[in-house]
Curated annotation (Swiss-Prot):
Residues 184-195 have a biased composition (Polar residues). Its main location: mitochondrion. This is Uncharacterized mitochondrial protein ymf2. It is found in: Mitochondrion. Signal peptide: none annotated. PANTHER family: CYTOCHROME C BIOGENESIS CCMF C-TERMINAL-LIKE MITOCHONDRIAL PROTEIN-RELATED (PTHR36010:SF1). GO terms for biological process: cytochrome complex assembly. The keyword Electron transport does not apply.
Length: 322
């Protein structure tokens, strides 16, 4: 057996804390809390009653309130509304921790990743969605030039799950390009030539690929950063992603990768493009990570519960300052 990865070890620690928090016996937790109580809470009931009566006879109202808070048990405290919200704060924090743990475990268990050399036009099955590398384009900036991958992420319909194999939509889809302000020349292999002049595949004056407008057989897309959501009559839902690999003029050996990310409430899709050639294919990585959104929600809820509990503690000790 090999060593555990850092993520698996982290999940194990989170599970241990989860069991320690929720599955310990009630008596054990009650005894632990009793050891941390203030010393004046262990007074005899008769002695506590005498202290309360004597404190009420004093004229200093602030001191009487503080003494009442210190003398009475927590379930009888009526000074301020924040003291009754302590169980609610605890539930928010523990609920956030549970959601965070669930997001970490499910995202690791349901993760789907493909890394390898892919020829143009090949189709990948990523769970219920399909991914196709439609083409490779070139982009030129002021200090760099880059190769830009053109990925299609779609969900096939239930009636025709193998849509590309049974009709002629795949060749048309692979060769389709944005038309507004575009001047594209293809050589039959599904990629455009080097952009020149004011009009090219990237739109007027070298506009970024993710901001390009619609396809000949589609309606106006919903444009977002790094990907474009489109509509198609044969697909239930599909979008395009444009990862880049940039090479800088100052140092040709230095290259950076721009990841295309698509995020929703349930799944995050990541697409990366590497080196390759049109004859052998291009190295690409497509990652599907579900339930990442729940990690953020759990972290926010746990932080909110901790802040509310801290505010309650500060309000509690403020009575002594007055």
């Amino acid at each position: 057996m090999g060593d555990f990865s850092y993520l698996e070890s982290f999940c194990g620690v989170l599970c241990f804390f989860f069991f320690c928090t929720f599955f310990l016996s009630f008596h054990h937790r009650r005894d632990s809390l009793a050891r941390h109580k203030f010393s004046f809470f262990v007074f005899h009931k008769q002695r506590r009653r005498e202290l309360i009566i004597s404190s009420l006879r004093r004229n200093n109202l602030n001191w009487s309130r503080c003494f009442l808070v210190r003398a009475l048990p927590s379930r009888l405290i009526t000074v301020g509304h924040d003291f009754r919200k302590a169980p609610v704060n605890m539930k928010i924090s523990h609920g956030g921790v549970c959601i965070f743990i669930m997001g970490v475990i499910l995202s690791n268990a349901k993760k789907i990743q493909f890394t390898g050399k892919t020829p143009l036009g090949s189709e990948l099955h990523i769970g219920k969605v399909r991914s196709t590398l439609r083409g490779i384009d070139q982009l030129h900036g002021p200090t760099f030039h880059s190769i830009c991958g053109n990925f299609i992420i779609y969900k096939p319909s239930l009636k025709t799950p193998f849509m590309f194999e049974h009709d002629g939509s795949r060749p048309a889809l692979l060769q389709s390009r944005p038309t507004e302000g575009a001047k594209v020349s293809t050589n039959g292999r599904g990629f455009s030539s080097r952009p020149t002049g004011e009009g090219n595949f990237f739109g007027p004056k070298g506009r970024r690929p993710e901001m390009a407008l619609g396809f000949p057989h589609t309606s106006l897309p919903l444009r977002k950063k790094g990907f474009t959501v489109l509509e198609h009559n044969s697909f239930s839902h599909w979008l395009t992603m444009f990862p880049e690999k940039r090479f800088y003029f100052s140092n040709q050996e230095t290259s950076t990768t721009k990841v295309a990310i698509h995020t929703n409430l349930f799944t995050d899709l990541y697409a990366l493009i590497g080196t390759g050639s049109f004859e052998t294919g291009w190295y690409m990585t497509v990652i599907k990570l579900p339930f990442i959104f729940y990690i953020w929600i759990g972290f926010i809820m746990a932080s909110l519960g901790g802040l509310l509990s801290l505010f309650r503690k500060l309000t509690f000790y403020r009575l002594d300052w007055n």
